[in-house]
């Protein structure tokens, strides 16, 4: 928690070096949120030199300890080739694991895999179901994806009123797609 306060700048200015130091202390005790945050720092180069390989190491450790955000981030790394070779099947597996905790981003990404057939056959019904679950958590990208389903009849009947409502809800949460 203290590391997070340094990160957001409790005294008015962020101190990423101090945040990294505190996250590293917590990570040494297998605190998964610290491991995941360090992974993100290394992926983005926030307060540290950007290093995709090191980011993946932190994500792996947190994912092995059950952190759903790290599991999703690891799926994204496999999907996009961040610090790893692109492997859509591994990405799909990590999104599935993270989705078991109902992490909205992972569930929405899983929906995209079903909709587009990124790691297997296209399954529009499963895509729709994933988007619905993630949208129920007020996750704007999933709300937009679900709106597209209603707009285009993907996994469901066309319902332009529902599509409009979902786009509007996403826009109210500052989604550029809403």
For every predicted segment, state its role.
Residues 1-8, 12, 22, 35-44, ...:
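Hydrophobic face of amphipathic alpha-helices that form TPR/SEL1-like repeat modules
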Residues 1-5, 111-113, 128, 167, ...:
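Intrinsically disordered, low-complexity linker/propeptide segments enriched in Ser/Thr/Gly/Pro
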Residues 8-10, 15, 23, 28-32, ...:
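Short helix-capping/linker turns of helical repeat alpha-solenoids
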Residues 11, 28, 35, 84, ...:
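Intrinsically disordered, low-complexity tandem-repeat regions
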Residues 54, 59-61, 95:
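Intrinsically disordered, low-complexity repeat tracts enriched in Gly/Pro/Ser/Thr and acidic residues
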